[in-house]
Curated annotation (Swiss-Prot), chains A, B, C:
Organism whose genome encodes this protein: Methanocorpusculum labreanum (strain ATCC 43576 / DSM 4855 / Z)
Family in the record: Belongs to the Thz kinase family.
Single GO molecular function: ATP binding
Superkingdom of the organism of origin: Archaea
Gene Ontology BP term (one): thiamine diphosphate biosynthetic process
Enzyme Commission identifier(s): 2.7.1.50
Binding annotation for substrate: 43, 192
CDD domains to which the protein is assigned, alphabetical: THZ_kinase
Catalytic activity, as annotated: 5-(2-hydroxyethyl)-4-methylthiazole + ATP = 4-methyl-5-(2-phosphooxyethyl)-thiazole + ADP + H(+)
Pfam family, one: HK
Protein's gene: thiM
Entry function: Catalyzes the phosphorylation of the hydroxyl group of 4-methyl-5-beta-hydroxyethylthiazole (THZ).
Protein name in UniProt: Hydroxyethylthiazole kinase
């Protein structure tokens, strides 16, 4: 647990700038969560703007939740520069499987860029892994098959870390496979939990190995969610409490509460 | 009251996917309110994306709060597919009357698509009904004439349900006319109450007759607003309490608290 | 203090419509803060829409936080009409200095339009004033040189009011120089504080002299922030408390708590 807790510290110390090109639904939550986690968010999507911004950023997060042609242009320009600069790229393929446009765009980024992390729910990752999956809008879907196997083989194929969010988050870099059991159901009752997790995976990947970074990110948000749920009266009051809990999360609390399993 | 309360249950049971093409100001509130109400939101606006998404959606909500040409393209593609699939289309003509662009766009959708619901404030609906109306930005305006008559005749003309939000919400499908007295002034002190109501009208229209659905939606949000106002110290604390109150609203509470009048 | 407190009253009395073309990250916060402050927000960016909207607006706020070509088109159309109508234009050059695109766009608006207010952090204003500045994404940066001098000379050069936000906000109209010490560090731990301040500067500039208006805006938000920080457990709970505190801020509280220095 110590090594994961240290990643929390590293983010807070180095305050990495996380460049995010994301959907217009949860973008404010992503910005605030990035700050609460100890990093700095910057949102920029114009092809004219992203190259300069990537030069000073430490990670790039691409979230396709409200995709369009203009946004793809900006994402490509940013990803090209991120590749050149060698900073980690996180892809959140929101809604892959629900529409062909989203699936194909996600695949395009997977095939054309050296992604550090692909993070989605079971339906999205299942779709991209080519296994039978059901996706309904942007809700978490289901897959046939073992998520550990799917994460492992997709990670191996693309040389990146794959995160499948769920009751147990599964994380694999193609070698190791880990599970994170932290979290509470109310986290699924607010819009943006997945998007915020991707932002935070970006912050962690900016300061550490992607696999360890994603484990840390998922466990930290899960623990904060558990903490926030203690006082929340519903999804409305959960959200501010969640931001507070992420901000005040200590190493000690992380080490005590993290439920991380190494499966392989 | 029983039949309206049952619509609440139906939404929670069937969890309809509500496709929303909406403004970038209140989109996060709309997503969260849709979830709190028991439905699922999905936001998608690219012409390349919307057709696939509509195929799995149960309602389409078009909100013109921050309109532009690209968004209109996406709205038209989505509305065409919604028409083909026979799912209800809700139009929230935000700011109609304030600018010609908004008025004409709203009219275009009214004339070209079989809308299930048109929901706006007095100024917006008055403008679209061709009565003398004052609209100031996106604030609720005033109309000359009886809102019951205006809602009734506009609904009749377009074969849809018309909702005029206000201290008393007026709802008509061209045959019946109903009023909903639930709600509190602080609901007008946060941005997005009207947009959230439209999202929830979409959720209800997905599982029931539009007229009954809109009555249910307006009464449910009004009751939740009354509940939330009891503990709120201002608009800031009202908002999370409002989301909590919608989430925890029971049938019993709805039946006890709904103030619905059938005028015709 | 009396004259500043009266500006608070004037905003609440006249309820000016503040037209905002802004970034998609903090737009909801800007809308809500505008309402809490006693004004009315309207967001509209399409060239086809902005001209009609400006005709009924009392101020225009341009925030370049998530700039793109389409948005610049809308900003230019709106600024041209605002110039014609003689309403104050506030520019928030978010991220100027971080990318050339942002710097040049900010300069373009400074050179082509009669701005009433330029409001940014030290790095942004330093960049635009041509002094050595460091900017990191959209975070507040540093400048070499005296912020009072920089604000004063930039204000003089452009015939407008310049606000440099910081631990002490510096405000100058090229003649007077004032400082506002209100505020708390947690205001920098939520996304959007600067954007909300620009919106509120627009509301105040709509009803008063820009210099006095900006002093009032910065002091009022600072005092409300101090109040909200008393009960906040972190950035998450700070935000709703901040909105509540702005809404309930009284003249008496303003006069008692404002820490405004006139340096020249």
């Amino acid at each position: 647990m110590q090594k994961y807790a240290q990643i929390l510290d590293l983010v807070r110390e180095r305050n990495p700038l996380v460049h995010q090109i994301t959907n217009y639904v949860t973008v404010n939550d992503c910005a605030n969560m990035t700050i609460c986690f100890g990093a700095s968010p910057v949102m920029s999507h114009a092809p004219e703007d992203v190259v300069d911004m990537i030069k000073i950023a430490s990670a790039l997060v691409l979230n396709i939740g409200t995709l369009d042609e203009k946004q793809i242009e900006g994402m490509i320009a940013a990803a090209n520069e991120a590749k050149k600069c060698g900073i980690p790229i996180v892809l959140d393929p929101v809604g892959a499987g629900a529409t062909l446009y989203r699936t194909q765009t996600a695949e395009r980024f997977m095939n054309e860029f050296p992604l550090a992390v692909i993070k989605g729910n079971a339906g999205e990752i299942g779709t991209l892994a080519g296994v039978s999956a059901t996706v309904r809008g942007v809700d978490s879907g289901n897959i046939s098959g073992d998520p550990k196997e799917i994460a492992h083989s997709l990670a191996k194929e693309y040389g990146c870390t794959v995160v499948i969010s769920g009751a147990e988050d599964i994380i694999s870099d193609g070698k190791r496979i880990a599970g994170v059991l932290n979290g509470v159901p109310i986290m699924g009752k607010i819009s943006g939990t997945g998007c915020m997790a991707s932002a935070v995976c970006g912050a962690c990947a900016a300061v550490s190995d992607s696999m360890d970074g994603c484990i840390t990110a998922m466990a930290a948000l899960g623990i904060a969610g558990e903490e926030a749920a203690k006082t929340a009266k519903g999804p409305g009051s959960f959200k501010p409490a969640f931001f507070d809990a992420v901000t005040s999360l200590t190493n000690e609390q992380f080490i005590k509460s993290a439920r991380i399993s190494e499966y392989q």
